[in-house]
Amino acid sequence: MLSNRRRFLQGAAATAGLWSHAASAKVAPVTLKDRNYEPLKLPRPISLAALTVLDVSPANQVLCAAKAGYSHVGIRLVPATPTETQYDMIGDTPMIREVEANLKATGVKVLDIEILRIKPDTRAVNWKAFFETGARLGATQVLCAGNDPDINRLTDNYAELCELAHPYGLNLSIEPMPWCNVSTVKQQGEILRKINRPNAGCLVDPIHFYRANNDYKDIDNLPAGSLKYCQLCDITAEMPDTMDGILYQARNFRLSPGTGAADLVQLLKHLPNLPISIEACNANLALTMSPLDRARMYLEDMVAVLNAAGEH
């Protein structure tokens, strides 16, 4: 059950914050001495997505995940937008070494690396160092987006990328998003059937799944083995009336699992036994709560949803 303060913060983010930009919060670095939480029993592997705590460095995201009680963390090697803080994350860099040191010190594992946008000019060979770095960190999943209007070319490039990534033990899952050229689960299923690669997958995220009017049967009809992991958050009942609004909400005003309008218990029935990445970025909460406290709140709420789904 959410406290009154937490419900107020969630509501504020869902209403006043949904349609206006929020300023970036200034927060102190996370340390292992910040706070002591009671251990949580995780029914599945649960990862802290990079976007959820993008206001701290990748190295501090590892510490945040560890202190909050996550089993895994997501690492953003390549920025998703030009406005976010840039880190040197490919190869043997100081930040990569700091991330490695924190992984070793905490025992947290890397679930996924991001983001690989498949564009018209994408060439698989140019992503070799990205895959090498991901393998170095122990990642098993790569978050991809389909950003090429020529679906045949996108499909060919995706197949080549999967082939290049396979020796590194990496699965490449395209995340269907309403504003991308690969926008639905059904469409990604068609691409998966064409390329027939064992390390190709479909990444389901509730905010995109429901905003693009996907159907549960589209998940069930994916080729066997296509679901490698999933993302979880919650959403407002009110849907933005423009694509820009949908995109802005997805990047800035997601809700904590189980506190919004999405039927996550039903969705989880179609995503059984998968590792979960909590991607619940919320710009308003970032102004009032530390990255660590947000991460812990999201984890507690996610475990509550899993328990409600009969997973303990």
Give each language-model segment a name.
Residues T81-Q86, I174, A212, N284-T288:
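A short acidic, helix-capping loop that chelates divalent metal ions and anchors anionic groups
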Residues V30-T52, E100, K104-L116:
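Mobile, glycine- and charge-enriched loop segments
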Residues A12-H21, V62, A66, N102, ...:
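Active-site acidic/histidine proton-transfer and metal-coordination neighborhood
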Residues A49-V53, V78-A80, I115-I118, G146-P149, ...:
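Active-site beta-loop-alpha junctions enriched in small/polar residues
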